[in-house]
């Protein structure tokens, strides 16, 4: 059954040049899990005949039922390459001299946008990515998102065009049209790569190129695939041409004239594009003969391509026969495997250029050098990217990758959570690792130790980590960088147990839920509510189902989904706001003003961040946003959480004792930024200026207890005098549909305050792509509504895109923002009505 044992895999783990860590990424429903099957069956884990239907990596019951991948799953597989293929691996760090075997750690990740946090976790522990694109629908919004994430993490992509069977059987494209489709997809992918990749960077050439063999074509469902390398091998002997030369000739503007045996770069009447003639024609002939049941032709063709049909398959015809023939002529596992082994980097190569992206500490300490050289003798550095639930309720495997050193069963290690700072004790545990295990899709295998460059699971550290963290044996190690998610949790639901006696179980269940999903947030409100926040409707639905069935095991009542809002201001405060401390000895004078457009986004994406050098940051703000240089240098802090899109600027001149109260003012600012004045939602895009401070001369009269609440009152007064506004989150919605259904889409979007900003036809197909902005608040039940209005022909994908100001003034009764504020205040148990300015503003 399986072609290898755990001991063999353990042996391969030391040959780090022959390891490939890769993930499969793509748009939803482009066929990742189906394609993964052909690799898994090549390794002998599942029967070849079942490949394409098994979806081996969809391990959960709801994944099989819904036919979507929800969690990313890992499999380790062992393969051997033939001598003739090994020649293509030129870099000495890409393979050991005498070793033909390769250990491939493959992670199948979900394509659905609601689970893109799972993709981020998968990308962090891998070095290469197989990007799957459906050749009928082309490059979609999610393909772009995941590809962008991959490039940002410095992960090398290779491309696979899936669903060729659809292009031939359903759309019945001509060879030339099909070539143009491929050409367009390759160009689109390369444009995305070029946009996000730094040219001349350490990764070298990242763009994909069919003539180099880094692009594959085929059909995962039927289990066949090829790269230009396979076809060149068939022709190289016959034409007596060098293989690499031929591969270059088979793609692009190369035309061949069979009469005169001449190549040319132009299209004439009697010559034909080489890709169509030598690659597509044979495939078309096989398809044509089999689907039109031409018995004699089939036998001739099979002799030519060297396929013999087994006895039990001899009475098949039509699609069934097509599958058998294509599968034995161009087996998908083989083509994919060669692409992976030849074009994806080994840990030795990849960690050289990924270290600076991964490690927060100095780039020349022991840990950094260990990661850079992928050295199993260096101190252990392992990054845990997610938690995987075990069969034992409430316990988790920590799933991650060893970047340097080796992890051994029973060794003592430092477990550092994401909030750990070197030299402090918080978020740090010294514990023993109970067991190390190997992840195999649906099964796990125990293993003694795992050296650097490999992916594994750990038992016994789940109590000390929430979701992610670093495990190390090096005393002065810093953390590995925290993962950046491309979506943010904006949809929330309040949950409560149906039977109040079950409350402790619910709390316990929420803790486990927070562990098991990289993205979900569980919040305890002060009013005693338990809130679960997720990326979208589907994400929340799956999380609540898990909570009910696996984590808490009790029946649960849930509220309607609620959207998080943000508070902001529209203009500068109309007066200088003054607040006095409770003992009347200290006074603060401040104003609020909105940030210029684009700055909050710059802060979110880290182009302006608190860790920058203040001079470079000030220069950036002055050039791009025309801030005053002296003020831009005196940004005290960002908030909320020290990194959010609001700033506190010191514009005062020569104030005594100012630095002594800085900490207290900052604490008050963080408090106000986290809970705004209108509805206690986070602030966004507000800049507060401190103009003057009068303080008492005795230090005892200006302690934190005097200053912090005063700062908060003063900031609230600033907000109320600066025309407060609410912001709501907006989805970018991409909808695929045939031309007839476009009208129905506009109707649905208009009813839901959405607006279309782009509409394009996918060249070569009858499909239209409509892009629109849709407020998250209006998106509940959108999919069902859309399908009923278009006869089930439209497929939407919604990604969180940006925040936009809700039109209207929340201070005017009966306006929409006013109602939102009232509902939120009621839900949070605050006093009804609007906050009163006189509570916060003092007279001189």
UniProtKB/Swiss-Prot annotation:
The keyword Phosphoprotein applies. Residues 17-348 form the tr-type G domain. GTP binds at residues 26-33, 162-165, 219-221. The modification Diphthamide is found at residue 701. GO terms for molecular function: GTP binding; GTPase activity; ribosome binding; translation elongation factor activity. It holds the Pfam family EFG_III. InterPro entries: EFG_II (IPR041095), EFG_III/V (IPR035647), EFG_V-like (IPR000640), EFTu-like_2 (IPR004161), G_TR_CS (IPR031157), P-loop_NTPase (IPR027417), Ribosomal_Su5_D2-typ_SF (IPR020568), Ribsml_uS5_D2-typ_fold_subgr (IPR014721). The modification Phosphoserine is found at residue 488. It catalyses: GTP + H2O = GDP + phosphate + H(+). SUPFAM superfamilies: EF-G C-terminal domain-like, P-loop containing nucleoside triphosphate hydrolases, Ribosomal protein S5 domain 2-like, Translation proteins. Belongs to the TRAFAC class translation factor GTPase superfamily. Classic translation factor GTPase family. EF-G/EF-2 subfamily. This is Translation elongation factor 2. It comes from Bombyx mori. The gene is tef2.
